[in-house]
Amino acid sequence: MPDPASLLAAACRRDPAGPLLTFYDDETGERTEVSATTAANWVAKTANLLRDDLDVEVDEAVAVLLPAHWQTAVVLLALWSIGAVPTATPADGLVVVAGAGLPVAGAREVLGLSLLPMNGRLPHPPAGVVDYAAEVLAAPDVFVGGEPSGQVDAERAYRRAGELGLAAGDRLLVTDAVGLADAVDWLLAPLAAGASVVLCRHADLKRLPARVAQERVSVTLGRPVSGVRPTG
């Protein structure tokens, strides 16, 4: 049975260097393009950090409180690679959060992501918060020994790819606020279909027509764009 980790591995074999996820933040001006190979490297480092340094275990529920972002995709794929279970509900286990809202009461560990361009560090991490950007680059580039989870999500991804009309080579524009609850649609279904994603946070609607042309967008999820095929 497929799992999210195997979907990423298939993307690496299919097109290792082409864009897998292109991220825009129109408030900060950031544009980050991540290939399948680069994504796999980030996922491996993050999985090693989570398992070896923060003691995340197979079947452990981990709260992922992150917005639409390329690093959100990395964290989710890393957790599935370990065999952990991403959840949107904070618990007494590890909590993964963005810079705002730190710390989280009752958490065993808090891993803080600044979500700044160039994997910037947290400006002033509170005591007890592990700064993702400060730790992840030192983690090993290869992850071994996990018991991948997310098989049900991967199975759903193949079905959703068909329902959304995604095909190999599609460039999917995502402009709505998305996160863990929508991960099958914006992350796993494109992986299953062999498509790639243009993920826009704080999208400036005036910039979308030019961006659609620049990124060769072929289909949109959420906000309609004139001249571009909607999903479904």
Report the location of each language-model feature.
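A short N-terminal helical cap/helix-turn-helix that marks the beginning
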Residues: 2-22
